[in-house]
């Protein structure tokens, strides 16, 4: 029997307060997160942003117990998925590959090779594809695969996204139904989907399918929920976790909550649609920040649907994804990460960024001036970045 390695891709998260700064550095050093005209700027900017943001982020992690539960939950998901796959007759072993914190992707690949796997299924724990989540993880795995003869020869099947998988939709609808039924008036309870946002340019310029998949997924869940409840509920989709001054997908969660409060919404059922595990965005951002904002805006009852975590129908859905993938053709990492519009993180043609012999000198001077301004603001504690809420 073929030995199957199932690689579960996820973001990762700091498990201790002292891990927050290094975790943020790894996050912002990824060109999929911040796109810059030169790779030489990536690490200095990542150091600067992680230094400036670590204090605020540490406070957030302290409010949920001092660290992220993401690794613990993901490893439990992996164990239960492995158990279920073996019950179905597969010789499967699961591996957790985090992008920005331990256990890193390199560790998962090393363990998989040491265990002598015969083929690989790559399953991102992101239902919806985005450049900055599944895309970044696929490309990191491809980087490790290139030049590694033992890894390169393994047949590989990548699951690009699964936002419309019946098992996922069913599990989400069931958990939402639990909270809707507990509302004062279940038929009028307003279902509020809060998805992690991405910059608008990802969708409009790079061809990222994330927004389309989120919207389609929301419609499928609401249809399934109506079948469970026997009636339709009003619902809203908004996007959270915006960082920086650039425009992200709208409506923003904060603004949508304020509007629902002004409309005298009595029962609000909040659904973390793009998150399959409890972590900082659910436990702190939604449960603390958004709950307070919604209450102040006038929402009477604020309920949050629990994350899928190890909910049995969800684990069954993941197992279905793996078995279906094994029945189909190989899907390469490059194919899984492909976008309709090619994204050039660092253009090979310098003119695409306005560079020529003279402008390159001025770009360097401006970059040094900007970096000096960053450092001055860091030392003084005052400046435009503080005004924009970045620091």
From Swiss-Prot:
Pathway: Porphyrin-containing compound metabolism; protoheme biosynthesis; protoheme from protoporphyrin-IX: step 1/1. Keywords: Cytoplasm, Heme biosynthesis, Iron, Lyase, Metal-binding, Porphyrin biosynthesis. One of its GO terms (biological process) is heme biosynthetic process. Gene3D superfamilies: 3.40.50.1400. Its EC number is 4.98.1.1. One of its GO terms (cellular component) is cytoplasm. It catalyses: heme b + 2 H(+) = protoporphyrin IX + Fe(2+). Fe cation binds at residues 196, 281. GO terms for molecular function: ferrochelatase activity; metal ion binding. SUPFAM superfamilies: Chelatase, Chlorophyll a-b binding protein. It is found in: Cytoplasm. Belongs to the ferrochelatase family. Catalyzes the ferrous insertion into protoporphyrin IX. This is Ferrochelatase.
């Amino acid at each position: 029997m073929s030995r199957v390695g199932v690689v579960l891709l996820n973001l990762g998260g700091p498990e201790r307060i002292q891990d927050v700064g290094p975790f943020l550095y790894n996050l912002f050093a990824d060109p999929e997160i911040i796109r810059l005209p030169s790779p030489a700027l990536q690490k200095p900017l990542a150091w600067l942003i992680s230094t400036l943001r670590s204090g605020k982020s540490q406070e957030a992690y302290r409010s949920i117990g001092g660290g992220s539960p993401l690794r613990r939950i993901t490893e439990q998901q992996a164990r239960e998925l492995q158990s279920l796959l073996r019950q179905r007759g597969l010789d499967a072993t699961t591996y957790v590959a985090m992008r920005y914190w331990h256990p890193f992707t390199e560790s998962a690949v090393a363990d998989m090779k040491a265990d002598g796997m015969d083929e690989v299924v790559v399953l991102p724990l992101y239902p919806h594809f985005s450049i900055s989540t599944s895309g970044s993880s696929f490309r990191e795995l491809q980087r490790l695969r290139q030049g590694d003869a033992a890894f390169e020869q393994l047949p590989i099947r990548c699951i690009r996204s699964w936002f419309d998988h019946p098992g996922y939709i069913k599990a989400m609808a069931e958990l939402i139904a639990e909270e809707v039924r507990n509302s004062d008036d279940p038929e009028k309870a307003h279902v509020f989907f809060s998805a992690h946002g991405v910059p608008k340019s990802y969708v409009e310029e790079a061809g990222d399918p994330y927004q389309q998949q989120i919207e389609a997924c929301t419609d499928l869940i609401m249809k399934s929920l109506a079948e469970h409840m026997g009636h339709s509920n009003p619902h809203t989709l908004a996007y959270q976790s915006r960082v920086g001054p650039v425009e992200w997908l709208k409506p923003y969660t904060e603004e949508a909550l304020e509007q629902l409060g002004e409309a005298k919404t009595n029962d609000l059922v909040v659904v973390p649609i793009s998150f399959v595990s409890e972590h900082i965005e659910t436990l702190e951002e939604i449960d603390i920040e958004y709950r307070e904002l919604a209450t102040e805006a006038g929402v009477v009852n604020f309920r949050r649907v629990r994350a899928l975590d190890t909910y049995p129908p969800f684990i069954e859905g993941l197992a279905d994804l793996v078995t279906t993938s094994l029945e189909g053709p190989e899907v390469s990492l490059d194919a899984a990460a492909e976008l309709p519009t090619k994204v050039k993180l660092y253009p090979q043609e310098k003119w695409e960024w306005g560079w020529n012999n003279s402008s390159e000198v001025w770009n360097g001077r401006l970059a040094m001036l900007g970096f000096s301004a960053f450092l001055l603001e860091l030392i003084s504690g005052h400046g435009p970045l503080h005004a924009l809420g970045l620091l």
